[in-house]
Amino acid sequence: MIKQVLLITALMASSVAHAGFYSGSALLSESEGYVKNKSGVATVAEAVNGGMFMGYIAGVFDTYAMQGNRNICPKAGLSVGSASDAVMQYLNEHPEQLNYSAPSVIMLALTATFPCERH
């Protein structure tokens, strides 16, 4: 079942990612499916939304990591789930930023949660 959801998520995310109009508000909406999926009570549609939430966060994180971003310094072994939890918490605590682009909000959340030590 999880493999099927991930496949559907990957197919759907490919049509969303290039548009560039994905907002923090849309991300927060999909986090509801993520929460329900973690609890084991998600419908298929909610599980897909939860998978899209996690996949979008992982994609933004990986993109910035490949570009050599030095503002996010998670401990080794950070899971997509932990990053997703951090972003979801940030979205709930900063509703004034829901109109920001999803990548911007994700980077703000991860930078706040996993700051780098400055020497």
List each language-model region with its residue ranges.
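Sec-dependent signal peptide recognition
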Residues: 1-8
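Compact alpha-helical subdomains of small soluble proteins
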Residues: 35, 62-119
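Short N-proximal segments of mature Sec-exported proteins
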Residues: 20-84
